[in-house]
Amino acid sequence: MVHGHKGVKFQNWAKTYGCCPEMYYQPTSVEEIREVLALARQQNKRVKVVGGGHSPSDIACTDGFMIHMGKMNRVLKVDMEKKQVTVEAGILLADLHPQLDKHGLALSNLGAVSDVTAGGVIGSGTHNTGIKHGILATQVVELTLLTPDGTVLVCSESSNAEVFQAARVHLGCLGVILTVTLQCVPQFHLQETTFPSTLKEVLDNLDSHLKKSEYFRFLWFPHSENVSVIYQDHTNKPPSSSANWFWDYAIGFYLLEFLLWISTFVPGLVGWINRFFFWLLFNGKKENCNLSHKIFTYECRFKQHVQDWAIPREKTKEALLELKAMLEAHPKVVAHYPVEVRFTRADDILLSPCFQRDSCYMNIIMYRPYGKDVPRLDYWLAYETIMKKVGGRPHWAKAHNCTRKDFEKMYPAFRKFCAIREKLDPTGMFLNAYLEKVFY
């Protein structure tokens, strides 16, 4: 029989959201999860499944039953002929990478953070960059879903296809993802080339940059014209790195955190800090080569608040210039660097922010130096206004102020997803406060 724990406090990685579930479970088998769901049905409790806890919002929070999938973390099957791997949903991508390395395989695209689970990373619509590549969930070829009534559904394009179309970005509201089968590619190395540019140059030549590099993104430093362009492309060069502890940590983390803390008393310093650190750390060309997963992912050092919306790719220039103009017109509104801009191809996943359109993701950030919150409301609201104006859709894992009315306008298939959810979970067992705002 599965045993739960009382008094466990859950906090997300950034320590910006937390909750105290009534019971906290760490099941080791499907039968143990079934027991938790049966208990929840008997006691009329809500259930939330969590993985790595990296979502910077309350999407994972509940005061009911919490299921942590960390003990269901095995690689179940590697199909070398199809280049596919089947894993339990609780496996961290950081633990999957070395397993794929052993078989000469890799995932074709990854997000920046690998301390996330296979089930969670697809459920929130996690993405990287590359206009020829989709969000991470597009690499899923099959998944198994345990529904609230205890039924296991095997879902793919040929089996339970409608549920599959919904469950690849499931928001944790359809049931418990048990296993995920991912389409891999042969192991490959990437060369990352970083060089300075300007916002005008990048926006004027956006199509050219997108063609030049398979995984192109750029970082804009607000309160300036400064941009750091990042190309990542296949290479046969041996691993090499320009990493340096003094510049990456002593300057890029410790000094930056101290100066950002000072700026909470003198907000006008933020523009100077952005320009100073661009000059200090980003004003020259750098190259790194390594296995793909070591280039895609990087250490996320700062606790932070973020927003990340996907807009139609053709609206990139308009939206960024409007954000820049807003900051220039309102000097008391400050914005930490960077605004990270990435690109992703269209897909057919019902609640994917890239549903039926090539997209540009525009991620804004406000750090929490020494855990201190920095005023961000004016920046947040202005950004959201611009994103909505150009047809944006918010990242599901990240905080936003949207409601069902907004999502019905944003997503052509929103009502179809709702119908699937209501059929699978008619009592709302897998809802929480975050999801109630989405669906009601």
From Swiss-Prot:
It is found in: Microsome membrane; Endoplasmic reticulum membrane. Its EC number is 1.1.3.8. Its main location: membrane. One of its GO terms (biological process) is L-ascorbic acid biosynthetic process. One of its GO terms (cellular component) is endoplasmic reticulum membrane. Its cofactor is FAD. The keyword Magnesium does not apply. GO terms for molecular function: D-arabinono-1,4-lactone oxidase activity; FAD binding; flavin adenine dinucleotide binding; L-gulonolactone oxidase activity; oxidoreductase activity. The modification Pros-8alpha-FAD histidine is found at residue 54. Residues 17-187 form the FAD-binding PCMH-type domain. InterPro entries: ALO_C, FAD-bd_PCMH, FAD-bd_PCMH-like_sf, FAD-bd_PCMH_sub1, FAD-bd_PCMH_sub2, FAD_lactone_oxidase-like, Oxid_FAD_bind_N, Oxy_OxRdtase_FAD_BS. Keywords: Ascorbate biosynthesis, Endoplasmic reticulum, FAD, Flavoprotein, Membrane, Microsome, Oxidoreductase, Transmembrane, Transmembrane helix. It holds the Pfam family ALO. PROSITE patterns: FAD_PCMH, OX2_COVAL_FAD. It comes from the Eukaryota. The chain crosses the membrane at residues 253-273. PANTHER family: L-GULONOLACTONE OXIDASE. Oxidizes L-gulono-1,4-lactone to hydrogen peroxide and L-xylo-hexulonolactone which spontaneously isomerizes to L-ascorbate. Belongs to the oxygen-dependent FAD-linked oxidoreductase family. This is L-gulonolactone oxidase.
